[in-house]
UniProtKB/Swiss-Prot annotation:
Membrane-traversing stretches: 341-360
Disulfide bond listed as a keyword: yes
Name of this protein: Killer cell immunoglobulin-like receptor 3DL2
Ranges where the Ig-like C2-type domain occurs: 42-102, 137-202, 237-300
Matching InterPro entries: Ig-like_dom_sf (IPR036179), Ig-like_fold (IPR013783), Ig-like_Receptors_ImmuneReg (IPR050412), Ig_sub (IPR003599), Immunoglobulin_dom (IPR013151)
Membrane disposition: Single-pass type I membrane protein
Major subcellular location class: membrane
Coiled-coil intervals, chain numbering: none
Membrane topology (Extracellular): 22-340
PANTHER family in the record: KILLER CELL IMMUNOGLOBULIN-LIKE RECEPTOR 3DL1-RELATED (PTHR11738:SF166), MHC CLASS I NK CELL RECEPTOR (PTHR11738)
Signal peptide bounds: 1-21
Gene Ontology CC terms, in alphabetical order: plasma membrane
Keyword Transcription: no
C-alpha cells in the first residue's frame, strides 16, 4: 500500500514538473532586448531568451500572428540580432526555451516583450517644468506635446532597457500633450530623456524622437568655489576669466549664467596645491551677469555638486549692465535691427552727398575751362590756324602771359603775321634757338600790362 502511494506521488511530481510551465508557473524563460526595446527605423536589436535552469536553444514568435520569415521554423542559440528593422517589426514578442526533460520539449512562453520602432511620424517637443536643473528630492514635470494628434505619448530615458512610460494624449486647442511626473528625484533618475508619439491603430510605430532633454540633479556633493580674474569688476573690453576649483577630484566643471538655458563645461585640471580647477575664458567684457559653477564625475555626468556661491561680474564704462534674458521679449533684438537700418541709411546718404559734390566740382571745373578758352583773343586763334596751314622749319617759340599763367604758342615769323595790328593785350617774348617749352609761374595780383617771371 505504501509502495503504491510512493509510486503515484513520483508520477504526479514528474507530470506536475512538465505541466507547471504551461500553467504559468515560475519555470518560464525571460525575454529581453539589448540595447533597448525602442529601436530606430533601420537599426538593430538583440533579443535574448534567458532561463534559470539554462538552455542554449530557443525559438521566437510574434503574438499578433503576423508572418515573420526569419522566425519561421528556426531555432536560435543564446541571442538573435534582428534588423534592419522596419515598421513591420514593431509588436509583442515571446520566446520558448528547449527543455529535453519536459513532456513537450519546450518551456512555457516567456514574458511579453514589446519592440517599438521609431521614426514614422514628425517629432514632438519635450519641456521640463520648473526646469531641467533640480535638487535631489524635488519633482519635475516633463511635458511632451505636438500639433500632430497623437493618441499616446511615450517617455524614455537613454541607456536603460526598460519599457518607456506611456500616457494617453490630451487634446487642447489643437495640440495633443501628456505630462509625465518624475520624482522625488534620485541619482538613478538623472539622465537624458526623449519622448515619442503614436497614432491610433499603430501603437508601436512611434514618431521620431524629440530633442534630448538632460535632467540634472544637484546638491549631492561639496560645492566648488568660483572666482574672476583680474576681478569681478572690469572695464569694458577687458579680458575676463572665471576659475572654478575644489579640493574634490571632480572630472568636469559646469559654468552657468542666470538667464541662459545652456551651460559651458570644461575638464578639471589638477593643480600644484592639490586642487582641481577649470578656467573659463569669457573674452573681452561687454556685459555683466551672475555666474555659478558645479562639479561632476565622469561616471554620473547628470549628477552635480552643490552650486558655488553666486559671482556677480560687473562691467564699467558700458551703458548696458546685463545681457537680455532669452525669456524676455524680442524688443531688444528689434532695437538692434533698427540700429543697423539707421546706420545703413546714413552711409547711403553720405555717399550720395559725396557723389553730388564730386559732380558739382567737375561741372564747375569744365565751366571755368570753357570761360578761359572763350577769353582767348581772336587773333591768337587766327595765328594758330595760319600756323597749321604753313609749316616753316624755322620756328620761333613764344610764351603768352595771361593772368599770370604762361601758355605755350607756336607761330610763324613776324614777317608772315597779318599787317593789321591786333588788339590783343597779351605780351609775347621771343625765345630763339630754344626748344618749345611752357612754364607756369604763380605770382601775386599785378596790372595786366606788367610782365613778371624769368625765362
Amino acid at each position: 500500500m505504501s509502495l503504491t502511494v510512493v509510486s503515484m506521488a513520483c508520477v504526479g511530481f514528474f507530470l506536475l514538473q512538465g505541466a507547471w510551465p504551461l500553467m504559468g508557473g515560475q519555470d518560464k524563460p525571460f525575454l529581453s532586448a539589448r540595447p533597448s526595446t525602442v529601436v530606430p527605423r533601420g537599426g538593430h536589436v538583440a533579443l535574448q531568451c534567458h532561463y534559470r535552469r539554462g538552455f542554449n536553444n530557443f525559438m521566437l514568435y510574434k503574438e499578433d500572428r503576423s508572418h515573420v520569415p526569419i522566425f519561421h521554423g528556426r531555432i536560435f542559440q543564446e541571442s538573435f540580432i534582428m534588423g534592419p528593422v522596419t515598421p513591420a517589426h514593431a509588436g509583442t514578442y515571446r520566446c520558448r526555451g528547449s527543455r529535453p526533460h519536459s513532456l513537450t520539449g519546450w518551456s512555457a512562453p516567456s514574458n511579453p516583450l514589446v519592440i517599438m520602432v521609431t521614426g514614422n511620424h514628425r517629432k514632438p517637443s519635450l519641456l521640463a517644468h520648473p526646469g531641467p536643473l533640480l535638487k535631489s528630492g524635488e519633482t519635475v514635470i516633463l511635458q511632451c506635446w505636438s500639433d500632430v494628434m497623437f493618441e499616446h505619448f511615450f517617455l524614455h530615458r537613454e541607456g536603460i532597457s526598460e519599457d518607456p512610460s506611456r500616457l494617453v494624449g490630451q487634446i487642447h486647442d489643437g495640440v495633443s500633450k501628456a505630462n509625465f511626473s518624475i520624482g522625488p528625484l534620485m541619482p538613478v533618475l538623472a539622465g537624458t530623456y526623449r519622448c515619442y508619439g503614436s497614432v491610433p491603430h499603430s501603437p508601436y510605430q512611434l514618431s521620431a524622437p524629440s530633442d534630448p532633454l538632460d535632467i540634472v540633479i544637484t546638491g549631492l556633493y561639496e560645492k566648488p568655489s568660483l572666482s574672476a580674474q583680474p576681478g569681478p569688476t572690469v572695464q569694458a573690453g577687458e579680458n575676463v576669466t572665471l576659475s572654478c576649483s575644489s579640493w574634490s577630484s571632480y572630472d568636469i566643471y559646469h559654468l552657468s549664467r542666470e538667464g541662459e538655458a545652456h551651460e559651458r563645461r570644461l575638464r578639471a585640471v589638477p593643480k600644484v596645491n592639490r586642487t582641481f580647477q577649470a578656467d573659463f575664458p569669457l573674452g573681452p567684457a561687454t556685459h555683466g551677469g551672475t555666474y555659478r559653477c558645479f562639479g561632476s564625475f565622469r561616471a554620473l555626468p547628470c549628477v552635480w555638486s552643490n552650486s558655488s556661491d553666486p559671482l556677480l561680474v560687473s562691467v564699467t564704462g558700458n551703458p548696458s549692465s546685463s545681457w537680455p534674458s532669452p525669456t524676455e521679449p524680442s524688443s531688444k533684438s528689434g532695437i538692434c535691427r533698427h540700429l543697423h537700418v539707421l546706420i545703413g541709411t546714413s552711409v547711403v546718404i553720405f555717399l550720395f552727398i559725396l557723389l553730388l559734390f564730386f559732380l558739382l566740382y567737375r561741372w564747375c571745373s569744365n565751366k571755368k575751362n570753357a570761360a578761359v578758352m572763350d577769353q582767348e583773343p581772336a587773333g591768337d586763334r587766327t595765328v594758330n590756324r595760319q600756323d597749321s596751314d604753313e609749316q616753316d622749319p624755322q620756328e620761333v617759340t613764344y610764351a603768352q602771359l595771361d593772368h599770370c599763367v604762361f601758355i605755350q604758342r607756336k607761330i610763324s615769323r613776324p614777317s608772315q603775321r597779318p599787317k593789321t595790328p591786333l588788339t590783343d593785350t597779351s605780351v609775347y617774348t621771343e625765345l630763339p634757338n630754344a626748344e618749345p617749352r611752357s612754364k607756369v609761374v604763380s605770382c601775386p595780383r599785378a596790372p595786366q600790362s606788367g610782365l613778371e617771371g624769368v625765362f
